Amino acid sequence: MKNEMLALILAGGQGTRLGKLTQSIAKPAVQFGGRYRIIDFALSNCANSGINNVGVITQYQPLELNTHIGNGSSWGLDGIDSGVTVLQPYSATEGNRWFQGTSHAIYQNIDYIDRINPEYVLILSGDHIYKMDYDDMLQTHKDNLASLTVAVLDVPLKEASRFGIMNTDSNDRIVEFEEKPEHPKSTKASMGIYIFDWKRLRTVLIDGEKNGIDMSDFGKNVIPAYLESGERVYTYNFDGYWKDVGTIESLWEANMEYIGEDNKLHSRDRSWKIYSKNLIAPPNFMTEDANVKDSLVVDGCFVAGNVEHSILSTNVQVKPNAIIKDSFVMSGATIGEGAKINRAIIGEDAVIGDGVVIDGSKEVEVIGYKEVVGVPNED
């Protein structure tokens, strides 16, 4: 695809609804599925779609994300004609540092985009779990002679009020956009994935800034402006698995759905692999008393207890007689002897003491990064 289309991943979200899990890292850097971070899905989709240049726009707590992405080699994006560029906010002459919205983040990086000089820009969110062929979406964009194409997912009517809803004609041309409507007319929900003709979007963003017109957000400002001016705006209809993991409940659900031979994400599909930074760890070890059922156990784990329908990430320790059920345990965590974990997310390097009970039967429980529970303070 060469430089025909540049992908820009919006990865600066703080993810306040994830609570303890994002106190020290950005939401796209949160672990998922045992060996991944959430942003791996967008990056892998880019690599599998033949996109050579990717800009990752960061903001909140970017260190872990920057370290994880590195030079892009884990996704094959470190070649002579390809690359991943991490783009951070900067202090502009008018004093703005933090991005004011999704499209404002693009405006602040116009110089970078112009250097790549793409015909199209693909705007992505770095905090969704899904697989998508962006090249197929681009072909739809071209076939419709569109200036903007919005990826949409058909959602249940009762959930439509949570999304930006696209009302279309019989040819999938968008005639109306409603942001979280109280009484939705359609069930076509925006996925926050857009393809724009770059020259046109560039003009819209620059003119908006020059004339004092708020163009800071794609959903609130840019899409309505395109429709009002009669631009050709179409949908790309997606029918695969897609999950917004912006809440504790949805992150837990997505991990539980990831377990199993027939998971909806088709994680074992060799034709569309999800790549990540390779971590060096020894093989996992299970004692003769260990009992592991219907679970994912990643390299480096030591298991001497009971694990059922759960995910153990890299280098997790489960001590004797511990019971873990319906839970996601992030890398480096230690589960003490006789501890009982049910419907929980255990953060990276957390320590759960001997005999501690964490029960999320009513509401998913969360233990944060390096949090220590039930271990006496040596001081």
Swiss-Prot record:
Pathway listed: Glycan biosynthesis; glycogen biosynthesis
Gene Ontology molecular function terms on file: ATP binding; glucose-1-phosphate adenylyltransferase activity
Pfam families: Hexapep_GlmU, NTP_transferase
Residues in the signal sequence: none
Enzyme class label: transferase
EC number from the UniProt entry: 2.7.7.27
Entry's Gene Ontology BP terms: glycogen biosynthetic process
Catalytic reactions on record: alpha-D-glucose 1-phosphate + ATP + H(+) = ADP-alpha-D-glucose + diphosphate
Name of the featured protein: Glucose-1-phosphate adenylyltransferase
GN (gene name): glgC
